[in-house]
Curated annotation (Swiss-Prot):
Induction: Constitutively expressed at a low level from a sigma70-type promoter. Zn(2+) binds at residues 155, 178, 181, 189. Involved in the regulation of the phenol degradation pathway. Activates phenol hydroxylase expression in the presence of phenol. It comes from the Bacteria. The gene is mopR. PANTHER family: SIGMA L-DEPENDENT TRANSCRIPTIONAL REGULATOR YQIR-RELATED, TRANSCRIPTIONAL REGULATORY PROTEIN. This is Phenol regulator MopR.
């Protein structure tokens, strides 16, 4: 292939550990928490022999072709994920130099050393040609160890990685073929890569990138099994599906058990819990699980209605009752006749409205504002508050007799931080909704984003989770993964808050102990090095200084 005049040409041997510091800086060993990270993707450090055992077991179960396809597809996904990270690291380099992050990552991962014979690429002209030697291929070694000499190339995962990485970077399907392989007796492995359309056997090559029919069969069987489960699920299981909330945790099920018992009766229910825990969803569940489900469900947020209008909003008004009342109209209770009324933030009711509500609960009757005629309605009341009603009674803000009437069946909705097992379910639930709403298909959350969400305390509970996921869906491009920054732009500040609070030093105590500033600096540096497992780049990031500065100070400590 003769490159076009303006096609970038890159032809030099990749030197081990040269110009890869930007990639190494993305790797974090967090031994304290048992985690290794490459940017936002969680990694594993494992024995290559494990992959050998896996390859052998899959070969015995599925045969050669399906095992090969499995490893190629695994490698393809790994290459795609690395390309997502590395594509943003080198904006000031030319196309070929930036592309080399992929081969460099192959080496950093300990998979293979890449030697460049030839590389031509141009995004504008959609041209690509690559010729690489692979040295020290882990996959060739594994294959020889488990199967002996092969009659065909055996670096399947490495090949998939190259295809996935190059396809992502170039924005078109790039396919590699392994022309030489150590597993079949060659001196080294060698691959050739170019666009799918330039291969004569394109159909055969793309077949290995496509989902295996066995996975389709398994998915079909799983769908059939799920349908059977839906048809025969027990009455006990149905108790947890009657609510419009989402969850499977023990705390969630306890709430469902309580509300299931209340749903079949006429008793007033008081839902208590922090803001955003889903009180209205549970209130709708009570209504849907009762004999009133075919009748109206009316939700009212008492905090949103001015105090001088709350009584007329709830119980209606007669024409001429006050300035602006030009016609008679029903209140919320009349609209909910035969059904359920949900009063959120009930503590915000005015004293007159509280008195009218108490009468409504005790006698089932009320009067419209400006009317003397008594009316009767049949309504089930579900009230909710995020405040302590008992304390509101002590403070004189809420009537004691109304509190006792509402407190017959209190249910406390747990905050999200106490039902963390439900977070993955809620994430899937909201992502499915927002993907449909914004006509996008996303690849879910990055490992680091998932990890952070599971540890976050969620002061805004489910409502906060919902809002963050909607924002992240808008910010994330189609077919991309949601990154932590899209969910929590301030995530670094959030992580630092706890650490800073715990590590503040009492300056007066230091002065009283005649401390040495040099010694304090040395202790801090040593602590950072220990925490980073002696990774200088990571320690420098923790200290907020450059690697060069930390290198200089480490030398001072050593020489001192």
């Amino acid at each position: 292939m003769s490159p076009a005049k303006d096609v970038k040409v890159y032809k030099k041997i990749l030197e081990q550990n040269k110009d890869i510091q930007d990639l190494l800086d993305k790797i974090v060993f967090d031994a304290q928490h048992g985690q290794i990270w490459f940017d936002e993707n969680r990694m594993l450090l494992m024995h290559t022999s494990i992959l050998g055992f896996l390859r052998k077991d899959l070969y015995q179960m599925l045969g050669l072709e399906r095992t090969k396809r499995f490893f190629i597809r695994c490698g393809y996904q790994a290459g795609m994920r690395d390309a997502e990270v590395t594509s943003k690291l080198r904006p000031n380099l030319n196309e070929a130099e930036a592309f080399m992050a992929g081969p460099q990552m192959h080496g950093i991962r300990g998979m293979v050393q890449v030697e460049v014979n030839e590389l031509h690429l141009s995004h504008d002209l959609k041209q690509f040609y690559a010729d690489f030697n692979w040295l020290n291929s882990f996959e060739a070694e594994v294959h020889l160890s488990e199967f002996g000499a092969s009659d065909q190339p055996a670096c399947w995962m490495l090949l998939g990685y190259a295809c996935g990485y190059s396809s992502f970077v170039m924005g078109q399907t790039i396919i590699y073929q392994e022309t030489h392989c150590v597993a079949q007796g060659d001196e080294h492995c060698r691959i050739i890569g170019k666009p799918l359309s330039e291969w004569e056997n394109a159909d055969e090559l793309i077949r290995f990138m496509s989902p295996d029919a066995v996975s389709d069969e398994i998915i079909a069987l799983q769908a059939e099994l799920n349908q059977l489960k839906k048809n025969i699920y027990t009455e006990a299981e149905s108790d947890y599906t009657m609510f419009n909330a989402v969850g499977e945790s023990v705390a969630y099920r306890k709430v469902c058990d309580l509300l299931k018992k209340a749903a079949g009766s006429k008793v007033a229910v008081l839902l208590q819990g922090e803001t955003g825990v889903g009180k209205e969803a549970f209130a709708r569940g009570i209504h849907n699980g009762s004999q009133r489900q075919a009748q109206p469900f009316v939700a009212v947020n008492c905090a949103c209605i001015p105090p001088d209008l709350i009584e007329s909003e709830l119980f209606g008004v007669e024409k001429g009752a006050f300035t602006g009342a030009v016609q008679s109209r029903m209140g919320k209770f009349e609209r909910a006749h035969g059904g359920t009324i949900f009063l959120d933030e009930v503590v915000e009711l005015s004293p007159r409205a509280q008195a009218a509500l108490l009468r409504m609960l005790q006698e089932g009757e009320f009067e419209r504002v400006g009317d003397s005629r008594t009316r009767q309605v049949d309504v089930r009341l579900v009230a909710a508050t995020n405040e302590d009603l008992e304390q509101a009674v002590k403070d004189g803000k809420f009537r004691a007799d109304l509190y006792y009437r509402l407190n017959i069946f209190p249910v406390i909705i747990p905050p999200l931080r106490e039902r963390r097992e439900d977070i993955p379910l809620l994430i899937n639930h909201f992502l499915a909704r927002f993907e449909n709403m914004y006509n996008k298909t996303l690849k879910g959350l990055s490992d680091k984003a998932k990890n952070f969400m599971m540890k976050y305390d969620w002061p805004g509970n489910i409502r906060e989770l919902e809002n963050l996921l909607e924002r992240a869906t808008l910010l994330t491009d189609h077919q991309q993964e949601i990154k932590l920054d899209s969910l929590f732009p301030q995530h670094k500040d959030l992580e630092a808050v706890g650490e800073t609070a715990q590590s503040l030093i009492n300056v007066e105590d230091l002065f009283s102990e005649n401390f040495s500033l040099d010694q304090l600096e040395q202790n801090i540096i040593r602590s950072a090095m220990d925490k980073s497992q002696q990774n200088v780049s990571e320690a420098a990031r923790m200290l907020g200084i450059s690697r060069a500065t930390l290198d200089y100070r480490l030398k001072k400590i050593t020489l001192g």
